Amino acid sequence: AYLARGGNLFILTDTGRQEVMNPFLSKLGIKMEEYQLAQSSADFSPNLILAKATRESEKLTFGFKDDFPKYDLRVSMPGCVALTCSDNDYGFQYTPILETNAKGVWIEKEQTDLQESPVECNASAGEKEQTYITAYALSRQLKDKEQRIIISGDADCISNTELTLSREGYRSGNFNLIIE
């Protein structure tokens, strides 16, 4: 009823929640991938995804247009899943707002504990390095109101830890994400 009336939402998903979340997200035309993302890094554990703003997100707000590219901001997303958009027409306009690098990031299908385990992309297991979407903005017009929904493939990105943590080597855009 809330969605049908045009209510706005910020939906935060996480690894291991696909079974619960995918039936709900399918009503919005979004799907969580089955396995979590891994990112190769000499400095951080493989479960830490450093997502960047997409070019498409620049049309949404000033911060995505100016701050994210100007300062090369990244949103730290520990334990993140990729999101995909269906081809079905649900009446929404879909804008990918956060994405991974094209190199060094893949959906890890073999290992589940990515905290400390070294992992590498295994093409024979169906793993592929490419750009993955980690957050979408959905919008649609309902009568005289615009409905807005943000869906993120990680809930920890807005936790107190990720909002305040400073890691060497990149500038955090986590706080910028929630104020946009």
Question: What label would you give each PLM region?
Answer:
Residues 1-180:
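Acidic, S/T/G-rich, low-cysteine, solvent-exposed domains in lumenal/extracellular/periplasmic regions
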